[in-house]
């Protein structure tokens, strides 16, 4: 975590949005869980929402890499951005991690499916609003999938919504 903190200039900042990408298998989810646990140990409330894995899969990964997940980390397996927004409020989250943005959808934009450019941009926009426009500032990490050209899958404009774009290069 100290290396991550160094790369982002001293650690995550509340009211900031960070996009984290890598090729498949590059360690995005593992790094995000590690960040979650480290933040929770500092007393922060963390919401980790996965649209790709079940809660038991997330817990299994956390047990494998961390031995145990801190009680201040709330794990959520759901691809509804509406539910993520509600959970962020209910858990009084200081840090929200969404893994990965291309798997989430807002009900307002259905029947457009998760991964559709409109859904991806609108979901990211909601996360920016959580970070910067809520009652309290929140740090947000958006995990993004890369395409075969090693670019962030979806719209390039997604990168412009973030304060920091990080690419894990294998």
Language model regions located:
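Proline-aspartate-enriched helix->loop->beta-strand connector
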Residues: 88-98
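Short, ordered loop/turn segments at secondary-structure junctions
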Residues: 23-25, 51-54, 79-81, 100-103, ...
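Structural recognition of the conserved hydrophobic beta-strand(s) that form the central parallel beta-sheet
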Residues: 48-50, 75, 96-98, 137-145
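The Walker A/P-loop phosphate-binding site
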Residues: 1-69, 85, 89
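Amphipathic alpha-helical transducer elements in NTP-driven molecular machines
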Residues: 1, 5, 14, 29, ...
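Flexible beta-alpha connector loops of hexameric P-loop NTPases
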Residues: 21-24, 69-78, 105-121
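Short, solvent-exposed loop/turn segments at secondary-structure junctions
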Residues: 104-108, 112, 146-153
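Phosphate-binding/switch region of NTP-binding enzymes
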Residues: 121, 125-170
